[in-house]
């Protein structure tokens, strides 16, 4: 039984890691290039968003909490289902983040087809701010 559970959890983790992703370097280049920009949602904690965040990103709140998921649901409900959406948090490595998976699952269930996770290998400061990618200085999170 333990082997079955272990195999199931490993398989589940592998599926989670196969979700569409974008690397910080590629996303920064996309933001700086001309053309259509994706809608960007910060699905993490308010303290991180208030400190520094990706320019143009909207604060949805922690997707690990019902209020954060409802905020994200309301924010995307006006968007076309084929609109490009990028989610990020930055509290910890993205594959261990308590906020990324619930946010992606919600958008998938709602029928959004172009949702990506910004891969933050360590945290937002180290993987986005330190390399010099664009940030906006702290703005009060509305949630």
Describe these PLM feature segments.
Residues 13-22, 50-87, 91-143:
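Rhodanese-like catalytic fold shared by cysteine-dependent sulfurtransferases
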Residues 3-13:
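Sec-dependent N-terminal signal peptides
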């Amino acid at each position: 039984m333990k082997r079955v559970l272990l195999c199931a959890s490993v398989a589940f983790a592998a599926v989670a890691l196969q979700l569409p992703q974008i690397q910080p370097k590629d996303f920064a280049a996309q933001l700086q290039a001309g053309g259509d920009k994706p809608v960007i949602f910060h699905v993490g904690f308010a303290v991180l968003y208030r400190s520094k965040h990706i320019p143009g990103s909207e604060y949805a709140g922690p997707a690990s909490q019902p209020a954060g998921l409802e905020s994200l649901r309301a924010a995307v409900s006006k968007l076309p289902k084929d609109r490009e959406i990028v989610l990020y948090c930055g509290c910890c490595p993205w594959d261990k983040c308590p906020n990324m998976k619930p946010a992606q699952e919600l958008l998938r269930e709602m029928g959004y087809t172009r949702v990506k996770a910004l891969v933050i290998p360590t945290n937002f400061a180290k993987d986005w701010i330190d390399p010099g990618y664009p940030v906006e200085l702290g703005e009060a999170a509305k949630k």
